[in-house]
Amino acid sequence: MTYTANDEENKGRSTDNNNHRQMDYNDWLPVTASREAKWYYSAFHNVTAMVGAGVLGLPFAMSQLGWGPGLVAIIMSWAITFYSLWQMVQLHEAVPGKRLDRYPELGQEAFGPKLGYWIVMPQQLLVQIASDIVYNVTGGKSLKKFVELLFPNLEHIRQTYYILGFAALQLVLSQSPDFNSIKIVSLLAALMSFLYSMIASVASIAKGTEHRPSTYGVRGDTVASMVFDAFNGIGTIAFAFAGHSVVLEIQATIPSTPEVPSKKPMWKGVVVAYIIVIICYLFVAISGYWAFGAHVEDDVLISLERPAWLIAAANFMVFIHVIGSYQVFAMIVFDTIESYLVKTLKFTPSTTLRLVARSTYVALICLVAVCIPFFGGLLGFFGGLVFSSTSYFLPCIIWLIMKRPKRFSAHWWCSWVAIVTGISIAILAPIGGMRHIILSARTYKLFS
């Protein structure tokens, strides 16, 4: 078989058309549609993604682990995930002339086009979906608490209706075209997360000065229950460091040049975000456990009742925050769904396609949130099941494959410590989380 000049010309035209179509797709997909983000966008996007519902569960995790193990787990998790996040920022442009804009693309570079995609994509989607389920539950519970504190005569309204109301709001916000279009929502969410963390800390300290436990034991009446609760506590802490699943996608929105690669402004934002994260986490975890001991609720704000106006304000701030967190995590799901629809199924990119796809996702998340509104168990179960992988050990495995650090060097040791820790969490935490869900389900009535 021979090729003519016309064949070569047609082949070149076909390649140009494919490249043009690919470029058009990237201009429409939410992750790559805009690359005009500033360094501080990455700061508040990361705070919004990280300081989510998980921070309110940290005193509960402390009550399951105790003072020493609880603080060690939080600080160690912060250090490990700070390191693994640095690895991901560095790997974003590790291949010359190419930007790895999405977590699955990084996996493909490390493990191969097919294997890499199927190793990373399902785990990333599970993180995004699990986060949105928890945020839907948290948004509904926080709004209910806010309303009941201000209007006690409305206590009869079911939690289900508040979860539905939160989902209705997400239906509207989910039509935002790309990551940068939700920057105001994300900024407001980041601000709220810091404020309600400080309110929870100050209110807990005030409560503790009036009356606090004389001893600080751990939950559980039997050795078995203590062990399972400890597993759940580890998963809850892992859930609090879930932001890695959106890091590359956030970095993809930042412009990059040979003189100023995207990793420089991105890392600047990450450092600011992680300083805010550890301040919020330690303040809330220590003050909440100090004030309530083993009797703290899985959401520390539920344990706080006075002053009513302050706790109402904190719950409303949580509600505002999880609105933004939901969007940050959902944007990656939207990108995956829409990419599949236009690239594989050959749908034409349109507003109608976006409306149908995103609305379907929000509705399904809401359905699960209504059926399984067990905040504490969800944190532990999902935190161990998939968050430990995407935040703790998967970035380190990819780093070892792509960068090949010298054996027994600092990076080699740090990576292996993170890998062993992450795998241990992945094995133990879901056991405790599932047990907590089963115990909660015994007293739960559907659509209550």
Swiss-Prot record:
InterPro entries: AA_transpt_TM. Pfam families: Aa_trans. The chain crosses the membrane at residues 42-62, 65-85, 115-135, 156-173, 184-204, 223-243, 270-290, 314-334, 362-382, 383-403, 412-432. GO terms for cellular component: plasma membrane. Amino acid transporter. Belongs to the amino acid/polyamine transporter 2 family. Amino acid/auxin permease (AAAP) (TC 2.A.18.2) subfamily. Residues 1-41, 86-114, 174-183, 244-269, 335-361, 404-411 are cytoplasmic. This is Lysine histidine transporter-like 5. Residues 63-64, 136-155, 205-222, 291-313, 433-448 are extracellular. It is a multi-pass membrane protein. It is found in: Cell membrane. Keywords: Amino-acid transport, Cell membrane, Membrane, Transmembrane, Transmembrane helix, Transport. Disulfide bonds: none annotated. One of its GO terms (biological process) is amino acid transport. The lineage of its organism: Eukaryota, Viridiplantae, Streptophyta, Embryophyta, Tracheophyta.
